[in-house]
């Protein structure tokens, strides 16, 4: 959430940032709403001060045996007590209205983010590796998985409906191996602390990371009012909500492998075959909590950590800097890692790494205190996929396909597969 004080002082900057995201200007309406809030609050405070002062004056008047003055003061206090509740309610209402308006404004992009309306304006930052070449025809992952008898979409549909998958045998083991490999890499070499967080969270957790109030259609809600997490970013980032952190101990780096749940409400007709876009999928998430000065360097580091997964798996990929119209709601800058899928003859997103400034820290009321500083500042947050298991599995299946239809196990995963080097058709 953006700071209303910053908006008052940078109205043109906000409207320019919103224009870059394809939205209209909002600074004037927000500032007007804030002026109303401040006027009402000042009036309320004046009434409260007068009530308190009049109450004290009653005692003084009675001590002086000035009953007429005491009676007038009592009448004034009684009237204030009658009108104060309405004024307090109006103050709460306008405060809630302003907070709601602020909570729906996306984060302001950094100056070096390319401006554009959609993914067509994203910029290739770097390309790593080369596209594989074979003599045999590339196939899509679902063709390979079904031919091996290890991927069952029809069975999943009978159980749960569309956009679910059943993995069996060595493909199920391969996805598990991918997750173990990623966690070992991030905890053993990259300095992240592994966490097993809740998969169900409350409204305020979703609000803190920016999923609420705008994106309810993308989420699954339980009958008791909790939410299934769309990403482990939500519980990992909210681990520091309503805390004051020691700035000397930052950054904090967390990682988790969790199921993620998304309704894909806006994806009708897209990627309907296979497991590219699922209601339920597994993902390794990376989250960093840091200070303002270190956030941009931490963004580059986090992206490099996610890239290392793809490098060790021997996968060709590119890094994209997302344009203003394609970035997520809470992000100030985002790098997407897009892995090459031969079966689709296309690059597809496998990781998204974002720096969010203090946008989420403000929503969560997460602060830090520096050693030499007075007071506190809102924490800066970052999140990234390290990486999505389902899409990593797809990439391995398509890039390591052999002419006979078997799949070679990448060297980095052989130990996690119990020494197995090739996945073949189920007996």
Swiss-Prot record:
Residues where ATP binds: 262-264, 349-352
Gene3D superfamilies: Bira Bifunctional Protein, Domain 2 (3.30.930.10), Serine-tRNA synthetase, tRNA binding domain (1.10.287.40)
A Pfam family it matches: tRNA-synt_2b
Swiss-Prot/TrEMBL catalytic activity: tRNA(Ser) + L-serine + ATP = L-seryl-tRNA(Ser) + AMP + diphosphate + H(+); tRNA(Sec) + L-serine + ATP = L-seryl-tRNA(Sec) + AMP + diphosphate + H(+)
Pathway in which the depicted protein is active: Aminoacyl-tRNA biosynthesis; selenocysteinyl-tRNA(Sec) biosynthesis; L-seryl-tRNA(Sec) from L-serine and tRNA(Sec): step 1/1
Binding residue positions for L-serine: 231-233, 285, 385
Record keywords, A-Z: Aminoacyl-tRNA synthetase, ATP-binding, Cytoplasm, Ligase, Nucleotide-binding, Protein biosynthesis
GO MF entries: ATP binding; serine-tRNA ligase activity
One Gene Ontology term from the biological process aspect of the record: seryl-tRNA aminoacylation
Keyword flag Kinase: no
EC number: 6.1.1.11
Principal subcellular localization: cytoplasm
GO cellular component terms, A-Z: cytoplasm
Entry's localization field: Cytoplasm
Domain of life: Bacteria
InterPro entries noted in UniProt: aa-tRNA-synt_IIb, aa-tRNA-synth_II, aa-tRNA-synth_II/BPL/LPL, Ser-tRNA-ligase_type_1, Ser-tRNA-synth_1_N, SerRS_1_N_sf, SerRS_core, tRNA-bd_arm
SUPFAM superfamilies linked: Class II aaRS and biotin synthetases (SSF55681), tRNA-binding arm (SSF46589)
Main EC class the enzyme belongs to: ligase
Entry annotated with the keyword Lipid metabolism: no
Homology family: Belongs to the class-II aminoacyl-tRNA synthetase family. Type-1 seryl-tRNA synthetase subfamily.
Subunit description: Homodimer. The tRNA molecule binds across the dimer.
Record function comment: Catalyzes the attachment of serine to tRNA(Ser). Is also able to aminoacylate tRNA(Sec) with serine, to form the misacylated tRNA L-seryl-tRNA(Sec), which will be further converted into selenocysteinyl-tRNA(Sec).
Notes concerning its domains: Consists of two distinct domains, a catalytic core and a N-terminal extension that is involved in tRNA binding.
Alphabetized HAMAP family for the sequence: Ser_tRNA_synth_type1
Protein name: Serine--tRNA ligase
Origin organism lineage: Bacteria, Pseudomonadati, Pseudomonadota, Alphaproteobacteria, Hyphomicrobiales
Protein encoded by which gene: serS
